[in-house]
């Protein structure tokens, strides 16, 4: 069980040890810093330190190989994220040059390409908002459903969002995918 220090300096040192282990991709050191639980790689991290799920933190801060290590150890790529950034959407939201490779890795480890996140968007909705045709192509090839609508606000599909935004490259990919579905 991880003991959270009461004093700010102690919490800062603990956070730094955790953050450094994530950024370096040190699996054993990270497990120890997080208290040594047998399944630390799939348990929410301490709220007091402003941390969420280990896989989400790794998506933002760790080497891609470490993300694979966490997934291979059993970290759930479909973790719940009440802030709206489940794994695929978290990966798409980064400015990492390898973000599409991370999305591919997540999907290869059974991440749901139709997961819901911020604004009830699917990863396709998020890729449209980012104007990322390559992400749309990857998601469609991985089984993402282009007919899904958000269940709030305008209840729109990713295609409707692309049309509204004037994102023709994305709209074209989505139209083509919808026409293949029949």
Regions found by a protein language model. Name each.
Residues 1-14, 19-37, 52:
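Extended repeat-based scaffolds of very large eukaryotic assembly and lipid-transport proteins
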Residues 2-18, 142, 156, 160-182:
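Ankyrin-repeat-protein effector appendages
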Residues 10-18, 43-57, 80-93, 116-122, ...:
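Ankyrin-repeat boundary/"N-cap" motif
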Residues 20-25, 57-63, 90-99, 126-132, ...:
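Ankyrin repeat A-helix N-terminal signature
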Residues 31, 68, 100, 104, ...:
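Conserved positions within tetratricopeptide repeat
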Residues 32-41, 68-76, 104-112, 138-145, ...:
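Ankyrin repeat domain, specifically the short helix-to-loop turn at the C-terminus of the second helix
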Residues 84-85, 93-106:
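Eukaryotic tandem repeat interaction scaffolds
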Residues 118-148, 159:
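A generic hydrophobic-segment detector
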